[in-house]
Amino acid sequence: MVVKVGINGFGRIGRIVFRNAVEHDDVEIVAVNDPFIETKYAAYMLKYDSTHGQFKGDIQHSSSNNLTVNNKTIHFYQERDPANIPWGKHGVDYVVESTGVFTTTEKAKAHLSGGAKKVIISAPSADAPMFVMGVNEKSYRPDISVLSNASCTTNCLAPLAKVIHDNFGIAEGLMTTIHSYTATQKTVDGPSHKDWRGGRTAAQNIIPSSTGAAKAVGKVIPALNGKLTGMAMRVPTANVSVVDLTCRTEKPVTYDQIKAAVKAASEGELKGILGYSEDALVSTDLNGDPRSSIFDASAGIALNDRFVKLISWYDNEWGYSRRVLDLIAYIAKVDAGK
């Protein structure tokens, strides 16, 4: 079952979702919309990427404002209003909303006017239900038309937190994500009225920042609601981030028991989502890793049998984008009654 998908917003995540779709047998991108990028430039940006390298395939653009990728036509539009994008004309059932602008149910559902059946927001949402693959996707219902794939950090933290809580219980915890810089940050110091630190040069500074990723885990794992919170440190790396979860467990546990539980989950029900490694990893080793969370067994520590620090890596671009497509493939099967 191949699902026809459209992408609104051909920025960082939009393009990485497209690249992942080429490797995803269940999903086919048939249309893209971005009002700020003309087709010729879109072809260039898709072909060349400073972080993930050159596109593995053939990309052409035509005078008819379409892209041809691996001999398949991708219809390209430049509509500012999502309601005007003719998704239905191309058989698009599911739209990836990756502009970062239309992140509420009310705004995102404008895509339905163009013929789309469902909208998947590739960002946290204030009101749309959030789903994290491997954690709560089974709570999806076919009557939901707008949903969120949460954030890259929530996708890293939630599977790990689920394993720890299911096996040993989490009484409370604090998370810090050491996060690569992103497009919202500055190349040189500049004005940022809501976040003064966020206006400082990304490539020169370690910048403390806020994140709702830990609290969002409480939305996808209700038993952890109110038990987790966290912050971010934006660091001068282009890609790959790492979660530090420091938590108090409800049951006494050794670090070896935690390692065994995570390893078992990574080889079982969370295979392909949660990884496990005892290698001496550094961030670039995870560039291009399609998993949501890669537990670093040799980096964590335990103070005692109820207080531990756990470390898990994630490619905040590639791994997250792969989950967007996995979520679409999953809900498509549910919608089809399979």
From Swiss-Prot:
Which positions form S-S bridges? none
Under Enzyme Commission nomenclature, its number is 1.2.1.12
Subcellular location, record wording: Cytoplasm
Q: Carries keyword Protein biosynthesis? A: no
For molecular function, the Gene Ontology terms on record are: glyceraldehyde-3-phosphate dehydrogenase (NAD+) (phosphorylating) activity; NAD binding; NADP binding
UniProt keyword terms in alphabetical order: Cytoplasm, Glycolysis, NAD, Oxidoreductase
Q: State the active site.
A: 152
Chain residues that bind D-glyceraldehyde 3-phosphate: 151-153, 182, 211-212, 234
What's the top EC group for this one? oxidoreductase
- Known pathway: Carbohydrate degradation; glycolysis; pyruvate from D-glyceraldehyde 3-phosphate: step 1/5
Q: Which CDD domains match?
A: GAPDH_I_C (cd18126), GAPDH_I_N (cd05214)
- Tell me, what is an example of a GO biological process annotation in this record? glucose metabolic process
> Catalysed reaction(s)?
D-glyceraldehyde 3-phosphate + phosphate + NAD(+) = (2R)-3-phospho-glyceroyl phosphate + NADH + H(+)
Q: Site Activates thiol group during catalysis: list residues.
A: 179
Q: What induces it?
A: Preferentially expressed in yeast cells, the host parasitic phase. Induced during mycelium to yeast transition and negatively regulated during the yeast to mycelium transition.
Q: Where does NAD(+) bind?
A: 12-13, 34, 80, 316
Q: Which family does it belong to?
A: Belongs to the glyceraldehyde-3-phosphate dehydrogenase family.
- State the oligomer form and interacting partners: Homotetramer.
Give the protein's recorded name. Answer: Glyceraldehyde-3-phosphate dehydrogenase
